Amino acid sequence: MEHKEVVLLLLLFLKSGQGEPLDDYVNAQGASLFSVTKKQLGAGSREECAAKCEEDKEFTCRAFQYHSKEQQCVIMAENKKSSIIIRMRDVVLFEK
């Protein structure tokens, strides 16, 4: 095998192991988390919201909720183990 082919196969292998942004989260439709430490951000998709959660440097993001109608993302330091869950329409809660 030529050097170029080996490099190409290696890059394809590394790319395939990354997975989807939401794979690291468990989701609950219609659940909202009461959180003290949070940020509200605009996001066009759940995946974009997950990326914002992963990239945040101000606190450790343990959960996020996505409001599809408003295209709003709320990233939070708390999760269901440390906070209260309330029922809410048109929202999906994602937790690590």
UniProtKB/Swiss-Prot annotation:
Keyword Disulfide bond in record: yes
Domain PAN: 20-96
CDD domains linked: PAN_AP_HGF (cd01099)
Disulphide bridges: C49-C73, C53-C61
Keyword tags: Disulfide bond, Secreted, Signal
Signal peptide (from-to): 1-19
Keyword check for Signal: yes
Taxonomic superkingdom: Eukaryota
Database matches in InterPro entries: Pan_app (IPR003609), Plasminogen-rel (IPR016351)
Cell compartments where the protein resides: Secreted
Tissues/organs with expression: Expressed in liver.
GO cellular component: extracellular region
Role description: May bind non-covalently to lysine binding sites present in the kringle structures of plasminogen. This may interfere with the binding of fibrin or alpha-2-antiplasmin to plasminogen and may result in the localization of activity at sites necessary for extracellular matrix destruction.
Name listed for the protein in its UniProt record: Plasminogen-like protein A
UniProt source species: Homo sapiens (Human)
Highest classification ranks of the organism: Eukaryota, Metazoa, Chordata, Craniata, Vertebrata
